[in-house]
Each structure stands twice: as C-alpha cells, then as structure tokens.
Amino acid sequence: MQKIKIIIASDSVGETAEQVAKACVSQFNSKNFKSEIVRYPYIETIENVDEVIEIAKENELNIVVFTLVKPDIKQYMEERLAENKIKHVDIMGPLMSILTDKIDEQPYCEPGIVHKLDEAYFKKIEAIEFAVKYDDGKDPKGLPKADIVLIGISRTSKTPLSQFLAHKRYKVMNIPIVPEINPPEALFEIDPKKCIALKISEEKLNKIRKERLKQLGLGDSARYATGQRIQEELEYFDNIVNKIGCPVIDVSDKAIEETANDIMYIIEQNKTNKSE
C-alpha cells in the first residue's frame, strides 16, 4: 500500500489548505493508499521553509500544499520545492494573480486576514446583541461591560445611536434621564470618560415632542411637550452630567451619523491618551 504524506505549509493556521487536501483525498479509494496530513502553521522564516522541505524529501510521494501570501517566503518556498523536485500545490497564488490582473490592485499579502475579518464580524454581532439587551437602561449590570454609555432625556436619539455604534463594534448601553427616576448608582462608579451625555436645545426638543404627539394622535398641549416640563428635565439632566463629569455632545441639529462620529472620536482619543 502506498503511503503519501501531504504537508500543509501556511503563514497562518493552515486551515484552508488542510480542508482542500481532505476534500481531494476523500475522492479516492482509501484502500489503495494511506494518506497522512501534517500541518505546519505560521511559516514566517526561511528556516521554517527549510524544515518543511526536509520533511518532504523523506519520501518522493510526499506532497506540499501551501498557502503563503508573503512574497519573499512564498518565492523561497517555490525555489526550494523546484530544486528538490517536490510535488506541490499553491492554493492561493493562481487566484490571487488573476484577481490582481483583473482589478488592477495589489493584495494585502497579510497572513490570517480572513480570520481577522471573521473576528470583526462576530464582534459586530455581539455588540448589536449587547445594544438590544441593554437598551433604555434595562439592566444596570451592563454598565461595567459597556464600551460606551449614552445618557440623555427622551428624544435625544439614544437608541438609534446605540445601534449605529454597535455596527461599528462598540458595546453601547443607553440610560434615559428622567427626573422621577434616579439613575442607577453604578452610573456614577464607571469611568466618566466612557459616558457621553446627549444634550438638546429646549426649542428643538419642544418641536420634536409636539411632532411625536401628533403622530400618536394626541394634542400638543400634553405636559410631555410643555416648556415647563422640558426645562425641568434639562435642569435635572445638567445636574446628573455635572455629578458624573462626562463629555457632552449637543445633538440639536446633528444627524445620527455626525453625532456617532463625534462619540467615536472622543472614545478613541481617550484610548490614545490612556496608552501614552
């Protein structure tokens, strides 16, 4: 019975090449030969390549299947394989060459980038689920876990901002500030720099609330939209903000995207300052 060793060489984990090798082997009658798939991940130096070549030279039936994207390592691998007459398959090279010609753009040549993309996707999903779970101050336990905490009175776009930022992979919790309800104590215990207060002008808020009442089929004379009630809420909001000592963004005449960009700038600046 023939014994064939398929050597997987990759500058990342080697999962792609191994899956291709397994798919190919499964197409043959395993009674006629015995195959062994050996994975050599994280090929980063010419010494790593030499190790693969030495293993491959042990048997003329051995095959090297590689996914290497760093040009210098890939070229060295191809030269060593050719000079030793080792059968080999470049999984990614041919397609990357065609894509380069077709779209007239050079590839990143960065190992493991597909896993980074997967990680980014799952972080986004996690952030979206977080925003839903902790929307409208549902559970104070979310405060220490949040990357960003938004506070503001009603109609300051807390929920849409939370969702927008979640799609940017930030875990966001929002808490409504209402005079009749004390904010959770944990709000005053978190880092104030990750808390963003959303401020709105009295005139703008009055207009928004009256429009909201119309949509609900109610008269615009409800206390919810009166100047006295709005002033009361804004004063209470200012007191809470002063107690926390957090940054404030005026959302009166801003689109969601613009406010979100301001929030991300503040948060990222704080991260930069912390690392210095």
UniProtKB/Swiss-Prot annotation:
It catalyses: N(tele)-phospho-L-histidyl/L-threonyl-[pyruvate, phosphate dikinase] + ADP = N(tele)-phospho-L-histidyl/O-phospho-L-threonyl-[pyruvate, phosphate dikinase] + AMP + H(+); N(tele)-phospho-L-histidyl/O-phospho-L-threonyl-[pyruvate, phosphate dikinase] + phosphate + H(+) = N(tele)-phospho-L-histidyl/L-threonyl-[pyruvate, phosphate dikinase] + diphosphate. Its EC number is 2.7.11.32, 2.7.4.27. ADP binds at residues 152-159. InterPro entries: Kinase-pyrophosphorylase, PPDK_reg. It holds the Pfam family Kinase-PPPase. It comes from the Bacteria. Belongs to the pyruvate, phosphate/water dikinase regulatory protein family. PDRP subfamily. This is Putative pyruvate, phosphate dikinase regulatory protein. It comes from Staphylococcus carnosus (strain TM300).
